[in-house]
């Protein structure tokens, strides 16, 4: 859902995503039109809500042609589609009559060391190994976890891996860094409920402006304290 708001110039926690007091700006036409685009998508007979594994099941029986997910579902999707597997960055959608680029939230993991641990040198050495080239290669080989090591990204088989290309293109072209401010913790549950209201048909083209404004006030009341 956030991908639609981000696509239509809505702003999460200021321009750099670090201003908790700024809250989430989905006000006015930009938010309403994003909501209307989601309502239109849900009303399309080709749309399937991926609840309870329906999307994966649909890929398996052929009733679903394309699946919107992430690299965490690679193993299951690859098993089903085999040589027909493909992956790309986020698509564009019509919002307010204009093609807009969907944008995902992007993030990363880090390996940290407790500064108060007893054996600092050993802990640092372990952290360097776990975040290093060899460990990233093992993660890729065993679990298809995409490496960030530039040397690994430049050689086969990583270089030509469709999944790697899709994720990196998404990160570089169709994503924004997910804010790490505390307000994000108060966003997810209301956002999930808003999404469910769209899927359930409670939010329509006729009441999109009203419902988006209610959602806007709700999330910012809890976030901006």
Model feature map: region roles:
Residues 19-49:
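Glycine-centered hinge/linker elements that transmit conformational signals in sensory
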Residues 49, 145-146, 164-218:
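C-terminal capping/gating helix-and-loop segments adjacent to ligand/active sites or protein-protein/ligand interfaces
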Residues 1-23, 64:
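Extracytoplasmic/periplasmic solute-binding protein
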Residues 65-70, 86-88:
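Paired acidic/hydrophobic, glycine-rich loop segments that form the ligand-binding mouth/hinge
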Residues 73-80, 116, 217-220:
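Pocket-flanking alpha-helical
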């Amino acid at each position: 859902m956030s991908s639609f708001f981000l696509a239509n110039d809505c702003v999460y926690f200021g321009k750099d995503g670090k201003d908790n007091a700024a809250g989430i700006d989905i006000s006015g036409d930009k938010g309403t039109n994003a909501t209307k685009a989601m309502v239109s998508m849900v009303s399309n007979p080709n749309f399937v809500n991926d609840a309870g594994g329906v999307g994966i099941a649909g890929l398996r029986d052929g009733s679903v042609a394309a699946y919107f997910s992430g690299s965490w579902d690679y193993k299951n999707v690859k098993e089903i589609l085999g040589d027909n597997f493909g992956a790309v960055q986020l698509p564009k959608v019509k919002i307010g009559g204009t093609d807009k680029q969907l944008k995902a939230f992007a993030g990363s993991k880090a390996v940290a060391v407790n500064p108060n641990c007893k054996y600092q040198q050993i802990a640092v050495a372990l952290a360097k190994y776990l975040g290093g080239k060899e460990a990233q290669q093992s993660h890729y080989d065993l679990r298809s976890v995409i490496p960030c090591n530039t040397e690994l990204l430049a050689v086969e088989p990583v270089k030509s891996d469709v999944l790697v290309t899709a994720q990196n293109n998404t990160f570089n072209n169709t994503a924004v860094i997910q804010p790490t401010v505390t307000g994000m913790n108060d966003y997810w549950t209301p956002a999930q409920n808003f999404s469910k209201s769209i899927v359930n048909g409670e939010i329509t083209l006729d009441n999109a402006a009203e419902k988006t404004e209610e959602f806007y006030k709700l999330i910012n009341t809890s976030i901006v304290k």
